Amino acid sequence: MARLAGVDIPREKRLEIALTYIYGVGKTRAHETLAATGISADVRVKDLTDAQLVELRDYIEGNYKVEGDLRREVAADIRRKVEIGSYEGLRHRKGLPVRGQRTKTNARTRKGPKRTVAGKKKAR
């Protein structure tokens, strides 16, 4: 397996797809990277030369914030919003959706499993 930005990328996949295994590199950035380095998107990772791997590694690490650095930056941004008490920070603290989605129904991913609440007692 080839290593780029501290990630083992799969040998059998096309390079354009394999690059998306790096956190912070999606399809668009993978395409931009390949265009800038002049490497074909259809090449399999196993067919890359060492020089091409070095060129890819240098380009990605030089131009993009990826993996640990990006994760740290995102976590720091969230921590800062929580500390200053912004609306987004409060939503993060409460574990609710941050970007204005409805919460009366749905939002189960952020809220977690349902906690059942006792219903009304029947009047006699």
From Swiss-Prot:
Which residue ranges run through the membrane?
none
Region labeled Disordered — which residues?
94-124
The Gene Ontology biological process terms listed for this entry are: translation
User: Per UniProt, which keywords does this protein have?
Assistant: Ribonucleoprotein, Ribosomal protein, RNA-binding, rRNA-binding, tRNA-binding
Matches recorded under InterPro entries? Rbsml_uS13_C (IPR027437), Ribosomal_uS13 (IPR001892), Ribosomal_uS13-like_H2TH (IPR010979), Ribosomal_uS13_bac-type (IPR019980), Ribosomal_uS13_CS (IPR018269)
Any GO molecular function? tRNA binding
Cellular-component GO terms for this entry: cytosol; small ribosomal subunit
SUPFAM superfamilies listed in its UniProt record: S13-like H2TH domain
Q: What does this protein do?
A: Located at the top of the head of the 30S subunit, it contacts several helices of the 16S rRNA. In the 70S ribosome it contacts the 23S rRNA (bridge B1a) and protein L5 of the 50S subunit (bridge B1b), connecting the 2 subunits; these bridges are implicated in subunit movement. Contacts the tRNAs in the A and P-sites.
According to the record's subunit comment, the protein's assembly and interactions are: Part of the 30S ribosomal subunit. Forms a loose heterodimer with protein S19. Forms two bridges to the 50S subunit in the 70S ribosome.
Protein family membership: Belongs to the universal ribosomal protein uS13 family.
* Protein name (Swiss-Prot/TrEMBL): Small ribosomal subunit protein uS13
